[in-house]
């Protein structure tokens, strides 16, 4: 399943994936056995390619992490557009780890997602939710920082 979620079979000359390819990513994820719901709010303004790519990759990595760490958890992907930002939030209903579990963000996945967001002038947080589950929340400016 992780191979399917991380699949990056784009030819070098094909355009980088963006939010326009989110339905395809969600279908691949569902076909791999993960239950995913998607909520989109607002109308997408014209976005720089870097913002499209960062949002897509953050969602892709989050889904990969759910498959790796939360098993068959249910996942909700939310994309919200406003005048200034694209907000991406990925929640799963997996169980929180017992005491002594690895700290959040010690792997390269969350670190890489955070780097993508901050490189564009945005931010990303990730952590366990009270009562169980995990949330990744990113804010990406509609216009990337100069």
Predicted segments with their positions:
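Glycine-rich ATP/GTP-binding catalytic cores of kinases/NTPases
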Residues: 1-146
């Amino acid at each position: 399943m992780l191979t399917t979620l991380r699949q990056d079979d784009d030819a070098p000359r094909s355009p980088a994936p963006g939010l326009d390819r989110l339905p395809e990513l969600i279908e691949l994820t569902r076909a791999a056995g993960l239950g995913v719901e998607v909520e989109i709010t607002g109308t997408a303004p014209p976005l720089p390619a870097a913002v499209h790519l960062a949002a897509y990759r953050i969602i892709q990595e989050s889904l990969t992490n759910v498959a790796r760490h939360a098993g068959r958890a249910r996942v909700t992907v939310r994309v919200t557009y406003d005048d200034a930002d694209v907000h991406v939030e990925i929640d799963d209903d997996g169980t929180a780890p017992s005491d002594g579990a690895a700290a959040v963000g010690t792997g390269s996945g969350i670190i890489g997602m955070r780097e993508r967001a901050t490189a564009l002038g945005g931010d990303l947080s990730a952590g366990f939710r009270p009562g169980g589950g995990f949330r990744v929340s990113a804010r990406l400016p509609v216009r990337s920082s100069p």
